[in-house]
Amino acid sequence: MHSSREPVFLAKTRRRQAVIAGALIAIIFFAFPALAQEANVYRQVLGLDSRKVVWFLAQMHLFFGAFVLGVPLFAVIIEIVGWRSNDQRYDKLAYEFTSLLSVAYATTAAFGGMLAFALFSLYPTFMGYMASTFKDVMFVYALLFFAETFALYIYYYGWNAMQNRTPYSARLQMIFKTIGVALFVVTVLFFFDIIGWKMRGDTRVFMALLYLLPMSIGFYLMKDLKSTHIFIGITLNVVGTAIMQAANSMAGFMMSPAGVNEAGALTDHVWVAFENILATPIAVHRMLGNLAFGGLVAGSYAAVKFIGSKNQAEKAHYDWMGYIANLVAVAALIPLPFAGYYLGREVYSNSAVMGNNMMGGDFSWTFIIQALLVGSIFLITNYYLWSGMTRIPGSDRYYKYIKYILFAICVSFAVWLTPHNLPLTGQEVSEMGGSQYHPTLKFLGLMPAKNAVINLIILATFFSFLLYRRGNKSDIVPISQQGRAPIVVISLA
């Protein structure tokens, strides 16, 4: 079905491998001279501020990385649905979602190499400290990249070759099922803290549900070449999640250091520093964010392809692709604020000063901009659902509810954006009557009000999605119009 594209893909593969290899060589070549510099030597590049350069590269790396980690999560699930239902439409859809990774993966690696080069060149002392603290983790981190690349290319380029559904021998199937059951038992014991090393409860749940459980399911399902391909996809997601958790743990250590003394020297096992208080909350938040981001980008791709389609069959396919992508995005977007609350709670429990700086101090306006973007995402998502309803025959009976949902979202959005106070100068405070708080609106800036309205926005989005789902459902016939024949038949029975 896709074999005609293979030579082009193989050529692209060689180019991507060359890009990745070049990035790794550049990192190695420039890292050692950077580490050889004197302490606290921080420099600019091309006259640009070093912080802005690192921020830009990190942000671009996160954008593409979120897409690369998010798309395989739902692509494998769609492939499993197609495999179990024997419906080639789902298999084709999963392949098309996966094909979007071909360019994004190489770009992610390129920006990752540039980010590493910028960090080691512009902040050699800091990166030297991080490398000495997490030297064991960094080697595992690099090996995980090789494992992810290997799994991704086998998963993508082996799609056609691994379509055979001829069952393996009964003995081989029994071996795989035994491994799956044994791994599931280990998962249960690990989940309830019966086995395994000491760790926080959220980290234990994260690793049990996203590492051990998927692998046990993958082994148990393996019975033919197609299910083996699905297992490779599951492995790809597990390795990608491990890469994300490793990066998040090192980022969390920068904000909530653990396992070190006042001088910053490691006093305990590196696992204590790795499993800091913010490591898992960031991982959970990013996991949902990656899934929502991947779904929205894939939906945008489907929308563009829908516009450029030449016939009704293609339009129907890409309309369905956009529907599935939007379903994934909404499913991840709805619990995302709760993951953000969880992360914020852990930030305040670790350092109230850091939390106050984020929400009411130096970064208060940045936090307001973030709130604006979060509210905009929900508003745009609802608008996408409403516009999608216009293409569904029979959904016009639900149009009357849209204005009420829109009103609730707009009012909630306004409350969500209302700040409790603003960082003002002395002159501005005196012009406001000696107070930096609005006499009425200050109450809308408190978290109880914001918690209420964000929950209302989430419920409104969920209600819009329910209307979108029920758009093509037929009306239920009232009992008064059904006649008495069913009643008589039931009574006779």
Q: What do the PLM-derived regions correspond to, one by one?
A:
Residues 32-493:
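Polytopic transmembrane helical bundles with strong interfacial aromatic enrichment
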